[in-house]
């Protein structure tokens, strides 16, 4: 690599300069404070783990996103975390071993082998919550409510929440007796919203008229809460699991909408985000003019099985950098500081420390520097007088 190119970062790898770093860190602190006020305990997970535990129960997508290397001490394969959720599940199942509901929150970098969206970062700063141990809908409602609370906190002018339930599609494919390959093919077509291809595939591979009707109507069932009533008519004679899923979606609308009347809840029964990972309610938050979800989550009830302790779970995660960039989160710049000219005077040092303890930002001069640089943002200077030290305006 030439000297000219040594400053280049790998594609998708980003750095945050002071203003952006301050914005992200300020938001991180605000969000973690909110999580803790809701009863979620902050945890810090390791950046690197054995892949045997890091990828357990997380699905093939996370495996492909994970950088792997060989541990020089054991010869085993290590992975750099691409998602903190499986680590939180390991903590819940093995490290903490608590009974009842267990609420955890986290914030930290993850690393991906490739961006998940076009021009996206391979080093997202993931922040999120996980609620373990509660199988009931109360947990899903709490997590969705917390996400809407967060979106309101960061100044999102209008909250758009896309909600689905993987149980609908799963029950229908089981009723149709699809093979794994057929199920995956239809899943991909639904995610692509390829109406013509869906119709062609269904009419070719599904012979029973009733089943054809279900699968052809599925991608059309999206909209406000009223679409759930229409879905009940469409799936009137479908497996009971479908009605259970629709009832859960209705309950979410009945509870969450009054809590957050300004939020727009959008139900999409063909939304299967994380289908191979989630087991029930799934959701994503969107901002006007942004095509990709700025936060997403859902229920995943089997992730703890591999750690010897199956626990129901639900949660959500977001990328702090994306939230800051998308929503232009406002953060107050640091207060102008006090500049202290270079000196080894013990009395000046004591005065500087007193100012810092009082909450002032004090920048000490170095070498022969007798005035602050512009980027140091100081509007006052510490000077020595006959009677002691004084802070004066610059």
From Swiss-Prot:
Main location: cytoplasm
Gene assigned in the entry: hisZ
InterPro entries: aa-tRNA-synth_II/BPL/LPL (IPR045864), HisRS-like_core (IPR041715), HisRS/HisZ (IPR004516), HisZ (IPR004517)
GO CC annotations, alphabetized: cytoplasm
Remaining remarks: This function is generally fulfilled by the C-terminal part of HisG, which is missing in some bacteria such as this one.
Function statement: Required for the first step of histidine biosynthesis. May allow the feedback regulation of ATP phosphoribosyltransferase activity by histidine.
Protein name: ATP phosphoribosyltransferase regulatory subunit
Family indicated by similarity: Belongs to the class-II aminoacyl-tRNA synthetase family. HisZ subfamily.
């Amino acid at each position: 690599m030439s000297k000219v190119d040594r400053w280049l970062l790998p594609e998708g790898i980003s750095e945050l300069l002071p203003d952006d770093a301050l914005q992200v860190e300020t938001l991180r602190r605000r969000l973690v404070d909110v999580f803790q006020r809701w009863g979620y305990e902050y945890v810090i997970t390791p950046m690197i783990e054995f892949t045997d535990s890091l990828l357990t129960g997380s699905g093939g997508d996370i495996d492909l996103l994970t950088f792997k290397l060989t541990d020089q001490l054991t010869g085993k394969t290590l992975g750099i975390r691409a998602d903190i959720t499986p680590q939180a599940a390991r903590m819940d199942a093995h490290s903490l071993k608590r009974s009842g509901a267990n609420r955890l929150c986290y914030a930290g970098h993850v690393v991906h082998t490739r961006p998940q969206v076009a021009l996206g970062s391979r080093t997202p700063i993931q922040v999120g919550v996980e609620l373990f141990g509660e199988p009931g809908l109360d947990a899903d409602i709490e997590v969705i409510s917390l996400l809407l609370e967060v979106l309101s906190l960061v100044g999102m002018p209008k909250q758009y929440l896309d909600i689905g339930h993987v149980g609908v599609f799963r029950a229908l494919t089981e009723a149709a007796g699809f093979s794994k390959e057929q199920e995956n093919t239809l899943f991909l077509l639904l995610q692509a919203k390829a109406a013509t291809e869906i119709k062609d595939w269904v009419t070719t591979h599904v012979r029973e008229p009733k089943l054809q009707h279900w699968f052809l109507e599925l991608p059309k069932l999206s909209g406000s809460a009223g679409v759930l009533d229409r879905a009940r008519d469409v799936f009137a004679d479908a497996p009971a699991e479908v009605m259970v899923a629709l009832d859960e979606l209705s309950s979410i609308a009945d509870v969450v909408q009054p809590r957050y009347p300004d939020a727009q809840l959008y139900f999409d029964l063909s939304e299967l985000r994380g289908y191979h990972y989630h087991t029930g309610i799934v959701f994503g938050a969107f901002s006007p003019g942004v095509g990709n979800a700025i936060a997403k989550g859902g229920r995943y009830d089997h992730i703890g099985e591999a750690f010897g302790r199956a626990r129901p779970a639900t949660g959500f995660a977001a990328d702090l950098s994306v939230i800051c960039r998308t929503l232009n989160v406002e953060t107050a710049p640091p207060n102008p500081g006090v500049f202290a000219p270079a000196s080894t005077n013990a009395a000046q040092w004591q005065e500087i420390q007193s100012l810092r303890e009082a909450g002032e930002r004090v920048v000490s001069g170095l070498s022969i520097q007798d005035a602050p640089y512009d980027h140091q943002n100081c509007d006052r200077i510490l000077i020595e007088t006959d009677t002691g030290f004084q802070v004066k305006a610059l």
